[in-house]
């Protein structure tokens, strides 16, 4: 065994190390002067000196910036003396090492065949006088996540052997089990009482006990994550009973609208709409919350990987063309001493999630072009990580495929290991301070290089017509993928034919593993050889593991033994419908009792520096949004490309002028007051952003993603009902159907007798077809002398606003939506932009008018003069701060040239709008109050500094 160390040349700055110095300083440890990071590689190999030199020189080290050394000393160490400390960190046994497969292939490409295995680690050389406790704090909070990593000590075994598995069929006695035993089984598998009773009755009729793999299959199929049993349950809400909340709200709106351009909704891995008659678009947003809480990097990376595979598995396979990401964290400056035991600090979660999404998306070659980041202390134990992907596929291939009995079940992509075990049941549960330890096998570490190869080959296989149906192997693993594909036919699987990462997996582990980068295909026997050869020729594994039948049974075999035999009808339709009661009562919060400040400079700067409003450029710059060459309007816009764009626009078909606008809406603080208006506001915000960049409402597809607490509590469930009802009402009013969605429930954390529940959170994502991308506009001011119009009504609606939050209040006047008036306003503004009457447009959201005009000014590097007494009001408001920071919905700022003002006002048809100021050839934003007294005068430099400083990491 060889140990190779690769490190930067001594005269070069270590960017990773400098970042760690800053992070260590944030912990309150100031004695660290420098950190150097060394890459460690262990090779289990029999190599000549020349071969070892070739691997180091040609593969592992960059001769321009790096040096290397090697030897046969396999031992890492924790070395410490007065001036420096050495710490090594490696992956735990069984955790996928993402670099290992790449190195193994590269070594083979060097014609070196004697490398059996590779492991990697990081060595941190920390300079400074530190005590043992300080080192432990640094390791615990920054360097080691015990879920997937460990400190390398002298006694560490680098290449532990994997035990062989000896087959033994495990049966679980449920027919004669006592009440206490049944309770244990129910808790182990996550069944409800009614569900376990149905299972007992099923096996009683068959006069046998279930095998462990049969119960695992039922637990996966009936999990909240997979079947959405709360949304599909029977809910008593007041005097009404709602039979299937999903069908009676979100899906009902889509059915009522009955848009011909909706090609596939709520039946495939993603929603599909017509793009141009030749091509179709598909869109899906998933959550990966619990895994990201336990291991942020891997959880977020596999979240992106999973939703990309959803797109690959839509219709007969789509090409991913854009990724989105929306994160909800606790504030990065959350006090360390208030972080509950068993969870990671929000700053570490934030950085890990960001890195996971960036690394996976960038390596897949998919632009990450739209997203949002929100902060609330209640996300401290349950971050929300929403990952979305937009795909493009031929319209004639947009409907879900259909296999025939006799078609082969082919597994392609990555190998199967223990990573991701029980992921869907883990995602359906409430977290505790033991979750990281108990559920460590639920975390997956993805390999984007494998997924990239799978992605490229599948498009070719699709175009050759080599398979009849496709789906991703994600949550629930083969159990979910094969179980769902075979629901209408039946399936027979030989589990010992599944390629494994290592030996020792039981038949059950093979079946429920959620190892990444895998897809399942239904392949006609006549196409199998060509398909297998195609994958092998591109260095991707493909294996025939079973066949589809015509008996509607799921039969699983291992080494010739029948280990599972379930009726598909019971598996998919035998689950008892959940019954629950929901209540909702309007809360009553204290109203603000502070006086209106005489001048509002400090308040505006404070809002620009708030975590929810401040620039997210540090995150955005680490995403590649230019790859594939389709970008039209980017996440950052303006004179220096550092202003906050409202939505992303891409041109996916290069010989067409048509584009796709992608946006989102989310504001959980409104849900504290009324989840109905929170949901309505999220829909309105997503649509506002489309209009602001030049889109329209003619062909907009919506997606819903609910992040909620424990819905077994009636008040929490009642809030969910309110939000779902608003989704229906807004979709109907705007004429914008929902095409896909996902819910993530039980986002709570229990410790020491306390429960932390996340705020009610609804993400609305939107994709709109734009007829001509040449009509796109951005939000930055363009020319001094232009008029600044406010479009829409400003009301005294600051409940849940950033301004009230900054003063320690919630309030009750939550922003509402007049959707019918809003639709007319948006339609008219859209036509005005299309006619070229608007130079710049920005929607008003968090921070209201004050933040919006400041963002337009700093992005365009042009000052402005604004008059609050010209703002159209829906009722009397006698406070300048309330007018400036109101968050009323359906409002825009529009920059219009004086020559176009008359045409603009005529186009708007007398709807509530008014010129409230002018763009100025100055470096100052000036705002005048109700009595024409100046209440804001801030330089553009101060505005930008306040806005950019918080996340200038």
PLM region spans:
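Short glycine-/aliphatic-rich beta-strand segments at the starts of folded cytosolic domains
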Residues: 1-10, 37-42, 81-93, 122-124, ...
């Amino acid at each position: 065994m060889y140990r190779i160390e690769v490190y930067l040349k001594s005269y070069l700055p270590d960017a990773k190390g400098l970042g760690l110095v800053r992070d260590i300083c944030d912990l309150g440890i100031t004695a660290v002067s420098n950190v150097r990071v060394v890459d460690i590689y262990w090779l289990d190999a029999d190599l000549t000196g020349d071969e070892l030199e070739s691997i180091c020189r040609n593969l592992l080290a960059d001769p321009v910036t790096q040096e290397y050394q090697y030897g046969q000393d396999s031992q890492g160490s924790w070395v410490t003396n007065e001036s420096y400390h050495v710490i090594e960190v490696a992956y735990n046994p069984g955790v996928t090492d993402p670099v290992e497969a790449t190195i193994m292939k590269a070594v083979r490409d060097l014609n070196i065949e004697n490398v059996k295995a590779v492991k990697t680690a990081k060595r941190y050389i920390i300079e400074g006088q530190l005590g043992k406790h300080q080192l432990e704090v640094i390791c615990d909070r920054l360097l080691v996540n015990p879920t997937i990593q460990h400190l390398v000590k002298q006694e560490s075994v680098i290449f532990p052997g994997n035990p062989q598995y000896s087959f033994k069929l495990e049966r679980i006695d449920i027919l004669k089990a006592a009440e206490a035993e049944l309770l244990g089984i129910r808790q182990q598998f996550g069944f409800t009482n009614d569900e376990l009773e149905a299972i007992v009755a099923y096996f009683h009729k068959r006069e046998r006990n279930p095998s462990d793999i049969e119960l695992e299959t039922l637990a996966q199929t009936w999990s909240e994550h997979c079947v959405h049993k709360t949304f599909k349950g029977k809910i008593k809400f007041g005097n009404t009973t709602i039979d299937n909340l999903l069908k009676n709200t979100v899906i009902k709106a889509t059915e009522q609208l009955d848009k011909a351009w909706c090609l596939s909704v709520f039946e495939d891995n993603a929603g599909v709409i017509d793009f141009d008659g030749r091509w179709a678009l598909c869109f899906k947003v998933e959550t990966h919350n619990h895994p990201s809480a336990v291991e942020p990097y891997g959880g977020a990376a596999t979240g992106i990987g999973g939703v990309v595979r959803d797109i690959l598995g839509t219709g007969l396979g789509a090409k991913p063309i854009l990724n989105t990401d929306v994160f909800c964290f606790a504030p990065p400056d959350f006090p360390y001493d208030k972080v509950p035991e068993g969870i990671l600090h929000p700053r570490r979660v934030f950085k890990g999630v960001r890195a996971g999404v960036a690394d996976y998306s960038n390596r897949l070659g998919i632009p990450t072009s739209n997203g949002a980041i929100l902060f609330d202390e209640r996300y401290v134990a349950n971050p929300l990580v929403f990952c979305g992907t937009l795909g493009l596929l031929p319209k004639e291939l947009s409907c879900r495929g259909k296999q025939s009995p006799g078609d082969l079940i082919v597994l392609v992509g990555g190998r199967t290991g223990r990573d991701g075990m029980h992921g869907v049941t883990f995602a359906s549960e409430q977290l505790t301070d033991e979750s990281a330890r108990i559920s460590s096998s639920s975390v997956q570490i993805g390999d984007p290089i494998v997924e990239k190869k799978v992605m490229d080959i599948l498009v070719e296989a699709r175009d050759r017509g080599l398979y009849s149906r496709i789906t991703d192997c994600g949550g629930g693993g083969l159990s979910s993928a094969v179980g769902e594909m075979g629901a209408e036919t039946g399936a027979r699987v030989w589990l010992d034919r599944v390629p494994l990462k290592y030996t020792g997996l039981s038949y059950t582990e093979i079946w429920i593993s959620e190892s990444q980068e895998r897809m399942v295909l239904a392949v006609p026997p006549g196409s199998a050889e060509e398909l297998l050869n195609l994958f092998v020729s591109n260095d991707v594994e493909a294996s025939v593991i079973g066949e589809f039948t015509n008996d509607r049974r799921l039969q699983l075999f291992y080494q010739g033994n029948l280990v599972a035999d379930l009726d598909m009808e019971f598996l998919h339709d035998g689950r008892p419908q959940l019954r629950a009661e929901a209540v909702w009562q309007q809360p009553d919060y204290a109203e603000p009792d502070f006086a209106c400040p005489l001048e509002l400079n400090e308040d505006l700067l404070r809002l620009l520096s708030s975590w929810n409003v401040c620039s997210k450029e540090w995150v955005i710059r680490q995403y590649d949004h230019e790859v594939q060459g389709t970008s039209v309007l980017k996440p950052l816009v303006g004179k220096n490309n550092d202003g906050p764009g409202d939505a992303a626009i891409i041109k996916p078909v290069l010989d067409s002028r048509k584009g796709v606008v992608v946006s989102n809406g989310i504001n959980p603080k409104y849900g504290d007051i009324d989840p109905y208006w929170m949901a309505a506001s999220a829909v309105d915000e997503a649509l506002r952003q489309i209009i602001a960049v030049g889109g329209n409402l003619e062909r907009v597809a919506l997606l819903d993603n609910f992040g909620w607490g424990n819905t077994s509590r009636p008040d929490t469930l009642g809030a969910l009902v309110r939000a779902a009802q608003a989704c229906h009402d807004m979709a109907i009013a705007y004429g914008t159907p929902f095409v896909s969605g996902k819910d993530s429930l039980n986002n709570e954390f229990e410790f020491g007798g306390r429960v932390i529940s996340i705020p009610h959170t609804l993400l609305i994502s939107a994709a709109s077809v734009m007829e001509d991308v040449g009509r796109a506009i951005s939000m930055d001011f363009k020319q001094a002398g232009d008029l600044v119009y406010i479009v829409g009504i400003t009301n005294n609606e600051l409940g849940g606003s950033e301004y009230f939050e900054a003063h320690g209040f919630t309030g009750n006047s939550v922003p509402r939506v007049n959707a019918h008036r809003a639709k007319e306003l948006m339609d008219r503004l859209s036509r005005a932009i299309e006619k070229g009457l608007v130079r710049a447009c920005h929607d008003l959201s968090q921070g209201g008018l004050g933040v919006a005009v400041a963002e337009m000014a700093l992005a365009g590097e042009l000052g402005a003069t604004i008059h609050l007494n010209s703002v159209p009001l829906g009722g009397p408001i006698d406070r300048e701060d309330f007018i400036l920071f109101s968050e009323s919905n359906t409002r825009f700022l529009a920059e219009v040239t004086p020559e176009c003002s008359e045409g603009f006002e005529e186009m708007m048809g007398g709807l509530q709008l008014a010129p409230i100021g002018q763009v100025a050839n100055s470096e100052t934003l000036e705002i005048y109050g109700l009595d024409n007294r100046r209440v804001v005068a801030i330089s553009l430099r101060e505005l930008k500094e306040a806005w950019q400083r918080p996340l200038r990491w």
